[in-house]
Amino acid sequence: MSSIIKMFNPKSIALIGATEREGSVGQAIMKNLMMGKDKRSIYPINPKRDVVMGLKCFAHIKDVPEHVDLAIIATPSNTVPSLVEECGLANVDGVVIISAGFREIGEEGAKLED
């Protein structure tokens, strides 16, 4: 299956930045993933948590026990470059970044975006 198909129909999803913190982006995405009716594996990633919404939480994407089709990164912009690199090293097929603090905040954010 091609990487683009896996992005739109992933069998396994890792949410980097998963949390139960009320009002956070990581919580909102996690809730939406958990409400999905299709059968796919969901892996919360957060080095500060052991469990998120009843699922075992992993410290890093490399710790996930199966191949990840899609990683969603919902963390501050300064963490994104190293997390994308970790996803590449873990052979993740696709990455979606949901973050702020890039070009819209000025020159420093633009450097991160590039």
Which stretches of residues belong to each language-model region?
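Catalytic-core regions of core metabolic enzymes
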Residues: 1-114
